[in-house]
From Swiss-Prot:
It is an enzyme of class 5 (isomerase). It comes from Escherichia coli (strain K12). Keywords: ATP-binding, DNA-binding, Helicase, Hydrolase, Isomerase, Nucleotide-binding. Residues 195-505 form the UvrD-like helicase ATP-binding domain. Its EC number is 5.6.2.4. This is DNA helicase IV. GO terms for cellular component: cytosol. Helicase IV catalyzes the unwinding of duplex DNA in the 3' to 5' direction with respect to the bound single strand in a reaction that is dependent upon the hydrolysis of ATP. GO terms for molecular function: 3'-5' DNA helicase activity; ATP binding; ATP hydrolysis activity; DNA binding. Belongs to the helicase family. UvrD subfamily. It catalyses: Couples ATP hydrolysis with the unwinding of duplex DNA by translocating in the 3'-5' direction; ATP + H2O = ADP + phosphate + H(+). PROSITE patterns: UVRD_HELICASE_ATP_BIND. GO terms for biological process: recombinational repair. It comes from the Bacteria. The gene is helD.
């Protein structure tokens, strides 16, 4: 059927289209120079209008586009419109049945996801959204018309809800799932550890996101959560023991975790590993070789001897090396270097040995060629760093030669080899769930190992437990931003905060939390105490009062109560401790550096050495170009890592903390603590 404009209407309308023809499933409008085909699957509405003389047809298309036919005789226009409209609606009714079937399939998919007694991840909801969008793009009708049809309307609205407010639907589902799990497994959460898990701990355990960061403040029971998570995966049948990988940062921590798992889960099938042990396993399985870790890794004296011998050789045999080293040590390090053959000076050798060891270690950790190291350095120090690398290159070569002679590898080499084996597909990861302790200590190299494992199976979950407030190992390569920007580095997921500490009282918590959160770069989180503490729970005291303080403690501290004396450095050990065994024989006193105290706790803590200067706390920045180029960037906030070290010291105590300061030359931290209403006592 065809509709044409009248001769006069055509002339007066001056419009590109003057005729229309109904097709099988569409309509064609045309003129002398133009033609436009409108398929029914793009047609939203047809309007028939009457002007002063002639009729007008209006075809509404997506994106607010309208095609018009003017100048037609009104009676013919009406007849054509009724015929076209009936044809279009018959076609639309047939197509709505197809659309209805597709929409019902999407509802079935949604029901499958939400009906399962499982956590709904962001990744899964994104997948459902993508599938719905793909299905809608394949519908025979424009989605704008779905509201018109009774057989499509309800299903379309449900699909729209998933497209528009998916996060709300996901949260609602997961909240219901979590409550159901906490009820169904109430006995498990009561018994899995020596004390029942609190709600925040239990919620972290059942969270099923593929990338989950559990922020565990000091004393909040992170080990309990890790053990419970492993037990939960077994209890739910979500993993077999061999599909769970539990990672710790040190051998001692791994052994303690193993013991806890045996004791609480009654299984020896889950074994905690260090990153180095994991790398060793991957290399053994992926290359059928059994690498030997160099004896030098555990022999500091032998390493120092190796590096000093090579350094002396280079300086004595090559004038350029001797000149370069003299310049480095005097200009950058500002050391006093003897005239003449300075490399033979034993005092200088002793001082330099640990530095050479550290710098070679940083180069090994980087793992790249010299050109790559130089290219990755900040531009403003790149030229100078290039000179330093050339001076260090022979020492790195000597290290590699020593490894070759021993037919061994070093720790950094282990992880690099493991990553290569994973990337080449020579080892297929059996682990569905990776649980990592002390995640704030992770380095880029270890993060790359985790990424290589997860790349093999996109469904592998990462359950990372850590505390950015206790990130104190940048000097060994740890990069705090891997925790603070967790999801940027490890993929979409969630964060859970363990909000209760079982260690210290509310006053210690208040001071420590406010102190650390003055740095806006630290993640904000709640950390509440179960016990109250008075204002004296944290006290500033002159360092001359240490003996008097220990005298007072000897009067009321119980024999089983531990007193921990902490300092920034080993050599800050108070002289008073030499007489402790006889003067305070009933006191259980331990001394350690703050770094060594990580993971420890005591009833009473005494922090010594709060002074300014070369041996001060906070420690002055003493990084060379090597550290600046090869370690993660220093944070903008002043003394950020030293502040975290102070937080660690404060939070070792259950009952009381005394911060002993130098009255003549106090640490900047003293003034900060005063501003947090920490009292200054004249005597204990």
């Amino acid at each position: 059927m065809e509709l044409k404009a009248t001769t006069l209407g055509k002339r007066l309308a001056q419009h590109p289209y003057d005729r229309a023809v109904i097709l099988n499933a569409g309509i064609k409008v045309s003129g002398d120079r133009h033609e436009y085909l409108i398929p029914f699957n793009q047609l939203l509405a047809i309007h028939c209008k009457r002007g002063l003389v002639w009729g007008e047809l209006e075809f509404v298309l997506p994106d607010e586009k309208v095609v018009r036919l003017h100048g037609t005789e009104w009676g013919e226009t009406q007849r054509f419109y009724h015929h076209l409209d009936a044809h279009w609606r018959r076609w639309s009714g047939e197509m709505s049945e197809i659309a209805s079937g597709v929409l019902r399939q999407q509802l079935d998919l949604i029901a499958t996801r939400t009906g399962e007694n499982k956590w709904l991840t962001r990744e899964q909801t994104s997948g459902v959204q993508q599938q719905i969008r793909q299905a809608l793009s394949a519908l025979p009708l424009p989605v704008n018309r779905l509201e018109e049809f009774d057989n499509c309307r309800e299903a379309w609205r449900k699909c729209q809800a998933w497209l528009k407010d998916i996060e709300s639907a996901r949260l609602q589902h997961n909240q219901a799932y979590t409550e159901a799990m906490l009820t169904e497994y109430a006995d498990f959460f009561r018994q899995v550890e020596s004390s029942p898990l609190n709600p925040a701990q239990a919620r972290a355990v059942v969270n099923g996101e593929h990338s989950l960061l559990v922020l565990a403040g000091a004393g909040s029971g992170k080990t309990s959560v890790l053990v419970a998570r492993a037990g939960w995966l077994l209890a739910r049948g979500e993993a077999s023991p061999e599909q769970i990988l539990l990672l710790a940062f040190g051998r001692k921590a791994a052994e303690e975790m193993d013991e806890r798992i045996r004791e609480r889960l009654h299984t020896e099938d889950i074994t905690a590993r260090t990153f180095h042990a994991l790398a060793l396993h991957i290399i053994q399985q992926g290359s059928k070789k059994v690498p030997i870790v160099s004896k030098l890794e555990n022999d500091t004296a032998a390493r120092h001897e190796l590096f000093i011998a090579e350094w002396r050789k280079q300086c004595s045999e090559k004038k350029a090396q001797a000149k370069g080293w003299r310049q480095w040590l005097t200009e950058e390090m500002q050391w006093s270097v003897p005239e003449g053959n300075f490399w033979d000076d034993e005092k200088l050798q002793r001082r330099l040995a640990s530095r050479l060891d550290r710098w070679v270690s940083l180069m090994r950790m980087h793992g790249g060629a010299q050109a790559e190291m130089i290219a990755s350095a900040p531009e403003e120090i790149r030229d100078l760093f290039s000179k330093r690398i050339k001076l260090m290159a022979p020492l790195l070569k000597a290290w590699k030669g020593a490894l070759k002679a021993e037919n061994a590898v070093d720790f950094s080499g282990l992880i690099h080899q493991a990553i290569v084996i994973l990337e080449k597909g020579r080892f297929i990861s059996p682990w569905k769930h990776i649980l990592v302790d002390e995640f704030q200590d992770i380095s880029p190299q270890r993060a790359a190992l985790l990424a290589a494992l997860r790349k093999q199976n996109s469904q592998t979950t990462l359950f990372a437990v850590g505390d950015d407030w206790q990130a104190i190992y940048r000097f060994s390569g740890a990069q705090m931003s891997l925790t603070t920007a967790f999801h940027e580095n490890f993929g979409e997921g969630e964060r859970c905060d363990l909000d209760t500490t079982y260690r210290f009282n509310s006053r210690i918590g208040e001071v420590a939390n406010r102190f650390i959160q003055q740095n806006p770069g630290q993640l904000k989180k709640p950390l509440n105490s179960l016990t109250n503490g008075d204002k004296k729970a944290v006290t500033l005291l002159d360092e001359s009062q240490l003996d008097a303080l220990l005298d007072k403690l000897s009067g009321y501290a119980k024999p089983e109560e531990r007193i921990l004396i902490l300092a920034r450095y080993h050599h800050m050990r108070p002289a008073s401790l030499e007489k402790a065994a006889t003067r305070w024989p009933k006191l259980q006193i331990d001394f350690m550096t703050i770094h060594a105290s990580k993971g420890q706790q005591a009833d009473y803590v005494i922090i010594v050495g709060l002074q300014e200067g070369s041996d001060g706390f906070p420690a002055a920045a003493r990084e060379s170009i090597m550290e600046e180029a090869l370690l993660p960037p220093v944070e903008d906030f002043p003394d950020a890592e030293e502040r975290r070290l102070m937080y660690v010291a404060l939070t070792r105590a259950r009952h009381r903390v005394w911060a002993l300061f130098n009255k003549e030359n106090p640490s900047p931290f003293v003034e900060i603590l005063k501003n947090l209403d920490v009292p200054v006592a004249r005597k204990p």
